[in-house]
């Protein structure tokens, strides 16, 4: 018999608006015993059926909705349908942007909560981030093999958020060949190397594709500083755009080594590229002291906000680092500044940049706004899916 979760009175409004999460505080009672991740039916306080989802007893998100259709079962066929729906959109994006690497499944926004799947050529890279996703692992992999028989599957569920779901970290080969140490993919005419096994996230930041193209369009004749460069995709884009010099800064020598390989792979002028292993905050202060100036600065830091308690400190960090960047720009220079923190609202991030400009003593115009690329959609009922935000700021 299916386990039933009943919401407290008045707590059904978010589900009626088709938001896919049920928080622990909204739960009145659970009838029956469910394993972690098992499929349950969700009802309002009067017993009306609302949704079918995955139960997660150890998480603040007590249930994640698989479907709002009462007759839809959660099985292999369900995952095949979801994959096919997602692929229809990715086919269009891949053709438009010349891609062989893209996000295939973006969790809740593709109706598959807690599941991230990136495709790099014929390798599918999984991240199963919730108890429900882990519980459905076998069904999902069977569905992937049905839809993508040509693809190997690799698991990168080595993500700390799994601990909040009571899950161990997981990584390794699932189906087919191991990915090579570095796998080349293509976007907007660039070739970029992906480290699936050891790289950040699933190996590469696919979400910044549109921003990399924007950087290319701003680069002609400019001296560029690429902060938190990782494997240098922004640097390659800047060189393709005709920059006079690009300096890439990261704390990881391994990432900088791949960045250099990316420049060489695209047969670009290596003499225009410099790779600096350093702390970005310290280097920006040193550059300010030395009187260094740039015409384009790319500021793409890692996530500063992991929970709401860190938001105030993150605001200070974002303001300080962007203030330093703005002080290094020539008049007419451009700062492309990003936040990948889902807990950082777009309007607050824009205010932080405005405050940074005041503290830097620079008059700044906002000229463009960015978000994650189109293969990272945001379903209308789940605004939390919009996590990446960015602005192009022009110094007057």
Curated annotation (Swiss-Prot):
Q: Which reactions is this enzyme annotated as catalysing?
A: cytidine(1962) in 23S rRNA + S-adenosyl-L-methionine = 5-methylcytidine(1962) in 23S rRNA + S-adenosyl-L-homocysteine + H(+)
Look up keyword RNA-binding and say if it applies. Answer: yes
Locations listed in the record: Cytoplasm
Matching entries from InterPro entries are given as: PUA, PUA-like_sf, PUA_sf, RLMI, RlmI-like_PUA, SAM-dep_methyl-trfase, SAM-dependent_MTases_sf
Q: What is its EC number?
A: 2.1.1.191
Looking up Gene3D superfamilies in the UniProt record yields: PUA domain, RNA methyltransferase domain (HRMD) like, Vaccinia Virus protein VP39
Chief localization: cytoplasm
- Where the record annotates domain PUA, the positions are 2-81
Name the SUPFAM superfamilies on file. Answer: PUA domain-like, S-adenosyl-L-methionine-dependent methyltransferases
Described function: Specifically methylates the cytosine at position 1962 (m5C1962) of 23S rRNA.
HAMAP family in alphabetical order:
23SrRNA_methyltr_I
Question: Which family would the database say this protein is a member of?
Answer: Belongs to the methyltransferase superfamily. RlmI family.
PANTHER family membership: RIBOSOMAL RNA LARGE SUBUNIT METHYLTRANSFERASE (PTHR42873), S-ADENOSYLMETHIONINE-DEPENDENT METHYLTRANSFERASE DOMAIN-CONTAINING PROTEIN (PTHR42873:SF1)
Instruction: Please state what the protein is called.
Output: Ribosomal RNA large subunit methyltransferase I
């Amino acid at each position: 018999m299916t386990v039933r979760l009943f919401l407290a009175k008045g707590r059904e409004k978010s589900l009626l608006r088709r938001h896919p999460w049920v928080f622990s505080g909204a739960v009145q009672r659970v009838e029956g015993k469910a394993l972690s991740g098992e499929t349950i039916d969700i009802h309002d306080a009067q017993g009306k059926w609302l949704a079918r989802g995955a139960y997660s007893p150890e998480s603040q998100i007590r249930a994640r909705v698989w479907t709002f259709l009462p007759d839809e079962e959660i099985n292999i066929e369900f995952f095949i349908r979801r994959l096919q729906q997602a692929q229809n959109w990715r086919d269009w994006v891949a053709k438009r942007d010349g891609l062989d690497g893209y996000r295939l499944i973006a969790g809740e926004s593709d109706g598959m909560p807690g599941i991230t799947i990136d495709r790099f050529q014929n390798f599918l890279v999984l991240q199963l981030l919730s108890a429900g996703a882990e519980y459905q692992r076998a069904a999902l992999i069977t569905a992937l093999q049905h839809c993508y028989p040509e693809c190997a599957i690799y698991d990168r569920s080595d993500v700390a958020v799994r601990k909040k779901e009571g899950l161990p970290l997981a990584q390794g080969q699932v189906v087919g060949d191991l990915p090579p140490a570095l796998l080349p993919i293509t976007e907007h005419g660039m070739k970029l190397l992906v480290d699936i096994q050891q790289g950040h996230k699933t190996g590469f930041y696919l979400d910044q594709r549109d921003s990399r193209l924007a950087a290319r369009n701003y680069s002609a004749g400019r001296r560029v500083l690429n902060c938190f460069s990782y494997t240098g995709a922004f640097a390659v884009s800047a060189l393709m755009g005709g920059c006079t010099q690009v300096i890439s800064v990261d704390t990881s020598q391994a990432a900088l080594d791949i960045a250099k390989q990316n420049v060489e792979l695209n047969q670009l002028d290596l003499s225009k590229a410099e790779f600096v292993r350093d702390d970005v905050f310290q280097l920006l202060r040193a550059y300010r002291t030395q009187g260094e100036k740039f015409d384009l600065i790319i500021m793409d830091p890692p996530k500063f906000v992991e929970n709401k308690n860190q938001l105030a400190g993150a605001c200070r960090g974002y303001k300080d680092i962007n203030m330093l960047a703005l002080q290094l720009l020539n008049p007419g220079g451009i700062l492309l500044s990003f936040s990948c923190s889902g807990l950082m609202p777009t309007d607050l991030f824009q205010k932080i940049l405005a405050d940074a400009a005041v503290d830097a003593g620079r008059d700044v115009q906002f000229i463009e706004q960015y978000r994650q690329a189109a293969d990272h959609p945001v379903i209308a009922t789940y605004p939390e899916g919009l996590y990446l935000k960015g602005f192009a700021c022009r110094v007057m």
